């Protein structure tokens, strides 16, 4: 969230870095929507709040649209990518995960409409894992830079992908643990 706020400030404050409206508006939408999704979504993992059905339902009615706006604006930014050619692969990785996030949010809505609460929780966990991958990417970049030095464009692509994959893997572990129930023995 802090990174998004700083990026939004950078885009709006510096006339030299003025982006065309085709990019500036989606960046603003993405940062605001993703911030809402990540902050409000964190509270959905609290059993005490999740068990308060009216709160959980109202929060979900904000989270789903925020998540879809975040995912679709990220997809838009990847499709209309206007950065250096060597960064195109990184944009395509982001596109894949933006589309995946939108898809899992749709699956979460379908699951809750069927009153399949376990599937809904699993799909929302996957969406949240993708959404908060920026933090994991920052950690991976920092560890890489401290260990091996600066990252080139090719390395950036792999590190961005690593952040998404790490979060997705952890989400699947949490989902399996949740559905497996307590271990006997």
Model-assigned labels for residue ranges:
Residues 1-185:
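Alpha-helical membrane insertion/targeting regions
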């Amino acid at each position: 969230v802090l990174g998004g706020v700083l990026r939004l400030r950078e885009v709006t404050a510096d006339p030299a870095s003025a982006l065309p409206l085709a990019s500036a508006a989606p960046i603003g939408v993405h940062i605001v929507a993703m911030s809402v999704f990540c902050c409000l979504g964190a509270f959905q993992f609290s059993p005490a709040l999740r068990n308060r059905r009216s709160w959980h339902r109202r929060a979900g009615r904000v989270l789903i649209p925020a998540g879809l706006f975040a995912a679709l604006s990220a997809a838009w930014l990847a499709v209309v990518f206007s950065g250096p050619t060597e960064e195109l692969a990184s944009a395509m990785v982001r596109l894949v995960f933006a589309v995946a996030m939108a898809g899992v949010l749709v699956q979460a809505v379908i699951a809750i409409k069927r009153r399949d609460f376990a599937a809904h929780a699993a799909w929302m966990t996957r969406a949240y894992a993708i959404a908060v991958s920026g933090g994991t990417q920052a950690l991976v970049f920092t560890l890489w830079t401290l260990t091996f030095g600066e990252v080139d464009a090719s390395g950036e692509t792999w590190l961005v992908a690593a952040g998404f994959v790490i979060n997705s893997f952890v989400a699947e572990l949490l989902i399996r643990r949740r559905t497996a129930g307590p271990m006997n023995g």
